[in-house]
């Protein structure tokens, strides 16, 4: 990836749909973060994935590579979080927009036009009688509005009324834009 970062072109938007330096940097950051956290949480000798060659310095190096790659992207001041000012709908719109070429958050995308270039996601989700849905684990992973885990008395109180635990006034607003809320069609 370092070679790709060195040789790819610099772009200031994603309209070309081509890989560029910042896409490679983002991929490097994601891989380095995954590797760092994997190694950090599997370094106990009784862990099935334990590797004695992985040192704390190596783990630190992965974290540092992740931070450096992210910093390189951020410091260019080209990309920014997509926002129309409506935090209760922006996340949903990010995934419902047909043309992402002018979205300042999107580094790289594939254009779908429905008539000529699409996907078979509905077919994949419905094979075998299943459907699109989310797991309890996914819902539980969303933090509260103040950034803390959703645990304890808060959970019990919210689960008394179906759907209350999904409310954007209680949880990260992205949760209510990821799952169907009671009353939504």
Question: Where are the regions that the model predicts?
Answer:
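Glycine-rich, acidic and aromatic/proline-enriched surface loops and short helix-turn segments
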Residues: 1-7, 27-37
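Flexible helix-coil transition and linker loops at the boundaries of alpha-helical arrays
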Residues: 7-18
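An aromatic- and glycine-enriched ligand-binding surface/loop that stacks and positions planar moieties
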Residues: 18-22, 30-185
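Long, amphipathic alpha-helical regulatory blocks in the mid-to-C-terminal portion
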Residues: 1-9, 69, 75
